[in-house]
Amino acid sequence: MYVEREIKKTFDKIITSYSMVAVVGARQAGKTTFLKQQMSQGKNIYILFDDPDVRGLFDEDLKKFEQQYLEGNDLAVLDEVQSCKDAGRKLKYLVDSGRRLWITSSSEVILAKEILSYLVGRISILRLYPFSYEEFLTAKGQKKMTAPVALRMMWEHMQYGGYPKVVLTDDPELKETILQDLYETMLLKDVARTFSIDDIDSLEKFARYLAVGPSGILSYDTVSNALGISFRTIKKYLDAMEKSYFIIRVYPYFSNKRKEIVKQPKVYFIDTGLRNIIAKTRNKEPDGMLFENYVCTELLKCGILAKYWRTKTKTEVDFIVEKSSGVVPLEVKLHAEPGKIERGLRSFIEMYHPKNALVVTYKGTHGQMKVNGCTVSFTDVAGMQQQLIEMNNVEPQLRPEYIKKIKKIQQSGNYTEFSSIKQLRDEIENKKKRPS
C-alpha cells in the first residue's frame, strides 16, 4: 500500500526549477518509495550505491559510469551516492552536463560543505520523516472517527511511531521486532560507521540514557558522570545521531542573555516508536515525556523547528514557535483544564506579550482564555497546526494574495503545505518571477 506523502506538493513545485533534488531523512522513512512513485513515464533508472560494483565505477571512472547507467535515461535516482569519493564535484559535472538527478540520503552527509559547496544553486533539498499523524491515519484508512477511536489511533502512533513498515504491520510483536532491527541498523550503520564511532557499547548506553534518563535540558556534566564519557564524546555522539535523523536538538529561545539559559539543548527522538523500543517501555498510556517528544516530532514534520524557553529560575515553556506574526508559546500537557495555565506560560506571556499561545493536550481539551491580552487556546495535536496557520490570518502586513492563498489551504484541509507565512510569501513571489 502506498501512502501519499505531505511533501508531494512542495516536491512537484521544486522539480520544475531544479535538475537535482535530494530527499533526505531517516532510514526506512519512505524516501525510495516516494521517489519511485514520482518517476513519470519514460526512461528512468534507479541506482543503488550500496552495490560495490556501482560504487567502484562511480569512484574510479565517472565517464564509464555515465555511459553504462545514465545514457538514454531521462532521469536517474541515485540512492546514497553522497558517501562516494569526491561526490560533490562529480554530481556538479553530471548536472552541468544536462543530467536530471534525484538523490536519497539517510544522513546529512549530503549537506557537508565539501559536497554542498559544489552544488549551491543546483540542488534543492527536502526532508522526509516517518509518517505524521495525518499520514498515519491515511495509512490506517481512518477518515471520520469518534473521539475514543481518534485517541486510540494517536496512542498507537505515539507508541509504535511512524515508520511506514511498522505502521503497515498489524501484529504488535512484529512491530517491535521491526523497530528493534531498525534501531540496530541505524545505530551501527548510519551513526557508528558513517561517523567513525568505534565504541558501540558506549554509544548504545548513551542512546538508552537519552531514552530513559531525566527529562528536560541535557546536562553534559550529568551525562558524563553517569556514563563515564567525556564532553567531547557526548558532543560527537549527539552530532552523529542528529545528522543520521536519530534525534533532534531543540535550542533555547532568548532575548535577555543574562536571565536565560542560552547553550544547552533539549534532546528528542525523531520517532517515538524508536524511543520506546530503546527505553523498553510497554505503557498503556503516554507519560508527559513521551507526549512532549511526540508533539515535537509533529511540529518537525510540518516544517516547524521549535525552540524552548527557560530562565535561570527554572521558569519554562515547552516550545516556542517563531512566526512572522510573532512568537507563539506552546505548552504540552497530558491533561489540562481550560481557564488554568502553568506559571511558566503565564510568565512568558507577561514578558513577551505574544498575541496567541497554545496549550496542546493529549485528550483534546478545547477552549480559550485571555491572559494579559494574549489569546490562549486549548487544543489537541490534530488541531495544533491548524491553529498555528490560522493565527497568521490576523497579520496586518499580509497582502490580499497571501490571505487568499491561506484561505484556499484552509478550505482544502492541507495545513502542512506551508509552515510559515514567510514560506508562503516565498512561494508566491517565486511564482511571480517565473516566465509565463
Features from the language model and the residues they span:
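Interdomain motor-coupling "hinge/lid" segment immediately C-terminal to the ATP-binding subdomain
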Residues: 106-108, 113-219
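Conserved lysine of the Walker
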Residues: 31-32
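Pre-Walker A adenine-sensing motif
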Residues: 1-15
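Hydrophobic anchor at the beta1->P-loop junction of P-loop NTPases
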Residues: 23
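Accessory nucleic acid-recognition modules appended to NTPase machines
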Residues: 172-327
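Short glycine-rich substrate-engagement loop in P-loop NTPases that contacts/grips substrate
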Residues: 45-75
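Small, basic N-terminal interaction modules of short regulatory proteins
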Residues: 384-436
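Domain-level recognition of nuclease-like catalytic cores that cleave nucleotide substrates
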Residues: 365-390
